[in-house]
Swiss-Prot record:
The gene is gI. It is found in: Virion membrane; Host cell membrane; Host cell junction; Host Golgi apparatus membrane. Residues 290-355 are intravirion. Keywords: Glycoprotein, Host cell junction, Host cell membrane, Host Golgi apparatus, Host membrane, Membrane, Phosphoprotein, Signal, Transmembrane, Transmembrane helix, Viral envelope protein, Virion. It is a single-pass membrane protein; Single-pass type I membrane protein. InterPro entries: Herpes_gI. Belongs to the alphaherpesvirinae glycoprotein I family. This is Envelope glycoprotein I. Disulfide bonds: none annotated. One of its GO terms (cellular component) is host cell Golgi membrane. Interacts with gE. It comes from Gallid herpesvirus 2 (strain Chicken/Md5/ATCC VR-987) (GaHV-2). Residues 19-268 are virion surface.
Amino acid sequence: MYLLQLLFWIRLFRGIWSIVYTGTSVTLSTDQSALVAFCGLDKMVNVRGQLLFLGDQTRTSSYTGTTEILKWDEEYKCYSVLHATSYMDCPAIDATVFRGCRDAVVYAQPHDRVQPFPEKGTLLRIVEPRVSDTGSYYIRVALAGRNMSDIFRMAVIIRSSKSWACNHSASSFQAHKCIRYVDRMAFENYLIGHVGNLLDSDSELHAIYNITPQSISTDINIITTPFYDNSGTIYSPTVFNLFNNNSHVDAMNSTGMWNTVLKYTLPRLIYFSTMIVLCIIALAIYLVCERCRSPHRRIYIGEPRSDEAPLITSAVNESFQYDYNVKETPSDVIEKELMEKLKKKVELLEREECV
């Protein structure tokens, strides 16, 4: 029973472990702001969460908006548009954003390895994660009629290990193109300042991609990949040597990798360890209090019987035992005399009747 109570409290504290990012138009709820995965070992990376309307984030009867997934590469100071979807005529039926929309158009999807699956509660999914997928990912949400957009950032770290090697050539990483920008802070301000479809409103991006929009249903998964014609303005890193002459990075000897893992996993490990210790202490205090509150009562078995002791030894009737040494009271003497007089009078009456 106590084990079940302990598991209940652990699950309760685990259930409230959620991060909420509040924007001007929408709110993002997720259970993780950073992920660490290993190439070859993890076949898929999922960032769980959902977009919500909370608090005073007002809504009309219907709305239109866009969601984009972008990646920032800190090493090369560039960003990539990984996925973008435009939603039209979405009814405000509940707190979930972009649910039950009349139509949705995917207008940017360079490859199908990075996709959102909002109907499954997945903000971002990376299939077959690679070392080049490491970076800061942004989910940008823009609603029509608003003067700014909301961006939500999360970190994804992919490393190779000694036991599980990445079987991706260096050329495969170069296929992922980037667009130069000043720095990450300027890039975030750039995203917030744009309203509406990022690719449609940005002339530079619109010139880079030849968009072929495809209408899809909001009830099915987005799996199509439109064609893109890359122009010369795209920044493609000329030196992207992740393997160091095709030799895999040994995660066990990588100081930076261990620092990253400790940075994101150690706080959670300390949190859960502390909660388990507190639950054990609370359980021990509860058991001690229960034992002190309901002690074992002693059973009365009476005093040892002697020859001169009365026969009554019950704990209940102990106060009613007869004491043979107690003298008669005056009332007892009067009653005795009355009884004797009454007896003599009865005998006298019987004699008179006989005569």
